[in-house]
Amino acid sequence: STNYNGYAVTKDGKLWSWGMSYTGDGGDSGSLSRGGSNTSPGKVTDGSSEISNVKRWGIDCKRNENVLACATASVLFLLQNGKLYGFGRNISGALGRGNTSTTSYAIEINISSVTPSISSIKGVFGNVSHNQYKESFGIISSENKLYISGDNYYPDGNTSKTSFTFILD
């Protein structure tokens, strides 16, 4: 969960959220963004229709897979077809979209320009700093390479990147 919302994936691969959703982290195009506490779950959408075919958890420790990650106010997840999606506040560009714009619905995260290239994503994870106003996400490729976006300490001396950046093998 983020600071404000909880999430669940149903058996049929639909993603639901509930909670306060002040910063777009409801992923429902704003229908939950009415302030206060939303105790009824809402379907996460892509802006016009509900998201389906979300890869189901069933985290397999031997394969080291994680398919949904949360940070302070953003969410990153994988679909069954291997595509990466995210939504939320996007603090410091943590979603890896190349910008810091908030999005209140799920959008595909383009990783085609990442170098070295990623053939498929094995897992995702989220990180929150001690002050909760900095967040980052990581991708682990099927080749076991680590890529990070958002607030972090990068090998080139930068502390924030808005696109996924290769870190290590």
Language model features with spans:
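Conserved core positions of repeat-based scaffolds
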Residues: 4-8, 17, 61, 74-77, ...
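Structural signature of eukaryotic scaffold interfaces centered on beta-propeller domains
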Residues: 1, 57-70, 124-131
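Structural signature of WD-repeat beta-propellers
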Residues: 2, 10, 36, 71-72, ...
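Beta-rich catalytic cores
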Residues: 2-3, 71-72, 102, 120, ...
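Short glycine/serine- and acidic-residue-enriched loop/turn motifs that recur at repeat junctions
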Residues: 18-46, 87-109, 147-169
